Amino acid sequence: RVTLRCTADLQGAMRERFGTTPVFLPEEDGSFHFDVPICVSDQFYGWVCGFGGKIEVVAPPEVRQGIREMTARLAEQHQ
C-alpha cells in the first residue's frame, strides 16, 4: 500500500483510476490524501511523475526513496 497526496484538481482523475473504494481525506490546503494498494514498479514511478509534481508519495519510505532515485537518474541523464 502507498499513501498519495494529490492537488485538489486531481480528484476526478484519481476517482477514475482507483474508483470509489479509497477514502479521500482532505488537507487544509485543499489537497487530499488516500491509501491505495499499488504494485510498485518503474511504471508506477513514471505514472506519478507524469502528473508534474501534483502527486506526492507520502508513504512508505522505501517508495519515497524509489521516486527520489528515479528522478535523480533522470536529472543526471538530462544534464
PLM region spans:
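Polybasic (Lys/Arg-rich)
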Residues: 1-79
